[in-house]
């Protein structure tokens, strides 16, 4: 019995389909076999995890720094990155707050290669020590504890806070106090107190006095007999007073951290500078790209991912801040970009009040206000 042309076509189609299925199954089994043998089938670099190249320090010589995630252990990291737990212990000896592999905790930094030790993770509310946001790396890593010191009468605790009680000043348990430790006297010297007349005592918009003028004698500086009140927006940028002049106090530093969430939580701006009530500058958050921190510059950084990464303030989209923490100085907030009176939305209160938001009652700018620009300064006294 002969096959009709129709049946021949159908049989040929079935045969071709079986061949295609056979080829696909062969490829699948080959892929599984190579994956199980440790050879990556689809790796663009031709290497599997088991053949990972050794990690190396970055361009600045800092070790390859990894952020501990939930569930991480040194053993798991050693297996994942083809090193040993002994390597990890050795590479991290002397690192800030390193507890050893047995006590690593989520959020900490750990070296997974040789190289210089990294700066510790920034703590949003820290006011002393190396974990104050924006702190620069010292020349000597051993100087970390002395960075951002507290006033001479206070101790700096591992939490980044200043105080005089035992939980700030005692070195037991180990690590409670990191700098200027030991009992502190509560008696304050009258000579150490300074007073100024320029600090406003009301909650109205801030006004400041003009810069003191000098007399005809070059060796003395006298105050003007009549203070001329001006608004912050009328200040012209002028160089700060010469620090070598004995009759002028050193330039003070202001610093503020502005958060996207209440309670000083979430991503944040960190701004600091050296302006006083006479030398005023306008920081436009959406445009600012000045990130250099020094004894003379004004900087503004945007910290994301819980303070692990930073960029320029211009890289942030935050316009409705919910809380802030001011370390020192005072800031006036404007909705626009020109720091002008008609855009005024509020100003900060003293640093002693800690984290300030709508719940504490200390957040002067209303919750729905747009933070477009800042004008910050530290009050400075001029003595004769």
Swiss-Prot record:
Gene3D superfamilies: LysM domain (3.10.350.10)
Recorded GO CC terms: extracellular region
Residues of the signal peptide: 1-35
Residue span(s) of domain LysM: 64-112
A molecular function GO annotation: chitin binding
Alphabetically ordered keywords of this record: Chitin-binding, Secreted, Signal, Virulence
Subcellular location(s) of the protein: Secreted
Gene inactivation effect: Leads to enhanced fungal virulence, with faster decaying on infected fruits.
The family this protein is said to belong to: Belongs to the secreted LysM effector family.
Function description: Secreted LysM effector that might have a role in sequestration of chitin oligosaccharides (breakdown products of fungal cell walls that are released during invasion and act as triggers of host immunity) to dampen host defense.
Domains: entry comment: The LysM (lysin motif) domains are small globular domains involved in binding chitin in eukaryotes. LysM14 contains one LysM domain.
Further comment: In plants, chitin acts as a microbe-associated molecular pattern (MAMP) that is recognized by lysin motif (LysM)-containing plant cell surface-localized pattern recognition receptors (PRRs) that activate a plethora of downstream immune responses.
Name of this chain's protein: Secreted LysM effector LysM14
Species assigned in the record: Penicillium expansum
């Amino acid at each position: 019995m002969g096959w009709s042309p129709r049946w021949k076509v159908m049989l040929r189609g079935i045969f071709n389909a079986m061949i295609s299925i056979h080829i696909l199954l062969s490829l699948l089994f080959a892929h599984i076999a190579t994956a199980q043998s440790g050879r990556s089938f689809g790796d663009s670099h031709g290497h599997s995890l088991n053949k990972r190249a050794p990690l190396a320090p970055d361009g600045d010589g800092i070790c390859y720094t990894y952020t501990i995630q939930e569930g991480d252990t040194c053993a798991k990291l050693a297996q994942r990155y083809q090193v040993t737990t002994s390597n990890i212990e050795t590479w991290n000896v002397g690192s800030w707050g390193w507890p050893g592999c047995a006590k690593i905790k989520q959020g900490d930094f750990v070296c997974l290669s040789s190289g210089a030790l990294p700066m510790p993770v920034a703590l949003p509310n820290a006011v002393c020590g190396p974990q104050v946001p924006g702190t620069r790396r010292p020349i000597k890593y051993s100087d970390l504890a002395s960075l951002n010191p507290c006033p001479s009468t206070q101790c700096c605790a591992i939490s980044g806070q200043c105080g005089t009680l035992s939980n700030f000043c005692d070195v037991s348990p180990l690590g409670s106090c990191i700098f200027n430790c030991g009992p502190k006297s509560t008696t304050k010297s009258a000579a150490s107190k300074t007073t100024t007349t320029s600090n406003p005592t009301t909650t109205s918009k801030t006004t400041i006095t003009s810069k003191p003028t000098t007399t005809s004698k070059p060796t003395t500086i006298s105050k003007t007999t009549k203070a001329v009140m001006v608004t912050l927006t009328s200040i012209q940028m002028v160089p700060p007073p010469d620090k070598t002049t004995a009759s002028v106090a050193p330039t003070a530093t202001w610093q503020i951290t502005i958060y996207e969430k209440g309670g000083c939580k979430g991503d944040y701006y960190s701004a600091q500078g050296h302006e006083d009530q006479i030398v005023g500058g306008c920081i436009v958050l959406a445009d600012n790209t000045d990130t250099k921190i020094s004894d003379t510059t004004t900087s503004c950084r945007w910290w994301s991912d819980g303070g692990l990464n930073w960029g320029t303030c211009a890289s942030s989209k935050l316009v409705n801040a919910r809380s802030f923490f001011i370390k020192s100085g005072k800031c006036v907030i404007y909705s626009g970009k020109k720091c002008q009176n008609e855009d005024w939305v509020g100003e900060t209160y003293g640093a002693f009040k800690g984290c300030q938001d709508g719940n504490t009652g200390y957040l002067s700018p209303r919750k729905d206000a747009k933070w477009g620009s800042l004008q910050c300064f530290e009050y400075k006294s001029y003595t004769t």
